[in-house]
């Protein structure tokens, strides 16, 4: 059997340098690409890196490791898999960004996958590649356009920090063991929890609001040692189009500091339903910040 190759192409109304920068910086991929949950990066040489990606494919949570070679002069990024997850045996690809003018560019995505002896695996891979790449290219176009036009009003980022007396591992375990939250957190009614691979978690929970209403949220989470837990919420209220965050845990003498860092989300344009003066962007930002900050501090409050 031979290697299977596919090419996708997309035209974007943004400078080639802007598009390339978004592709090169994997730290922002969870905010750019809908399938991407979290990415860890390790530099391995000049313009060389190894990345560990957690993402969804055909609705399933997967993870894999790839090595990448970046060529900022040619606006080209080559990648090849080092560790894959079934049914993928091997996978690689190339991003090529071609300038079409001062404010437009063409993206070419060349993708190849290794042979598989089972027809159903080939069908699964073809469907995953086609769906994922179309989502990624469309999302990249949207993000590139926003980055070129400046989107500060729509992006909200904040950090909450709490200091807790106790062992670092105990606090990490409390956040990590989300399946036990109904017995530990009063606002959590029920939890549906899966861990398809070590450290890769699917968390769906029903929470009670102060008015007694119950809301369902679903998130993918990645637990890394006892250092941090990254998450991406995929069921969102009308006010938001994106919600990602990272719990980071930093040990201090006699204390454990739990820090919710890089908590990023995009606010939806329709903000008229917030329980304050309708239609005010500043009010929407304050409301969302307050709500998320309260939720993020709930586990710490119960540990205090």
From Swiss-Prot:
Biological function: Is needed for correct cyclization of the oligoketide leading to isochromanequinone formation.
GO BP, one annotated term: antibiotic biosynthetic process
Pathway note: Antifungal biosynthesis; monensin biosynthesis
Pfam family, one: Polyketide_cyc2
Keywords on record: Antibiotic biosynthesis
InterPro entries: Polyketide_cyclase/dehydratase (IPR019587), START-like_dom_sf (IPR023393)
Protein name: Granaticin polyketide synthase bifunctional cyclase/dehydratase
CDD domains linked: OtcD1_ARO-CYC_like (cd08861)
């Amino acid at each position: 059997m031979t290697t299977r190759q596919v090419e996708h192409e997309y035209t974007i109304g943004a400078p080639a340098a802007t598009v390339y920068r978004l592709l090169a910086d994997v730290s922002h991929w969870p905010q750019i690409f809908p399938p991407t949950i979290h990415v860890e990066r390790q530099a391995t040489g000049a313009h060389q890196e190894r990345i560990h990606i957690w993402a969804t494919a055909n609705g399933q949570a997967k993870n894999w490791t790839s090595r990448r070679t970046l060529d900022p002069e040619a606006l080209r990024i080559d990648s090849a898999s080092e560790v894959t997850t079934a049914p993928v045996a091997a996978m690689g690809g190339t991003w090529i960004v071609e300038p079409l003018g001062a404010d437009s560019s063409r993206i070419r995505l060349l993708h190849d996958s290794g042979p598989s002896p089972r027809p159903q695996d080939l069908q699964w891979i073809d469907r995953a590649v086609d769906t994922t790449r179309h989502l990624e290219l469309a999302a990249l176009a949207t993000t590139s356009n926003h980055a070129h036009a400046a989107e500060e009003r729509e992006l909200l980022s904040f950090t909450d920090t709490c200091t807790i007396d106790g062992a670092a591992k105990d606090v990490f375990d409390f956040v990590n063991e989300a399946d036990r939250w109904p017995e530990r957190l009063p606002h959590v009614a029920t939890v549906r929890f899966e861990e398809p691979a070590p450290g890769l978690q699917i968390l769906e929970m029903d929470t009670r609001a102060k008015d007694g209403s119950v809301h369902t949220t679903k998130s993918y989470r990645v637990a890394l040692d006892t250092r941090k837990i990254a998450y991406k919420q995929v069921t969102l209220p009308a006010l938001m189009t994106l919600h990602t965050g990272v719990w980071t845990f930093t040990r201090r003498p006699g204390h454990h500091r739990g820090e919710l860092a890089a908590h990023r989300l995009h606010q939806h344009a329709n903000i008229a339903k917030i329980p304050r003066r309708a239609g005010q962007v500043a009010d929407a930002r304050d409301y969302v910040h307050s709500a998320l900050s309260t939720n993020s501090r709930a586990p710490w409050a119960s540990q205090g």
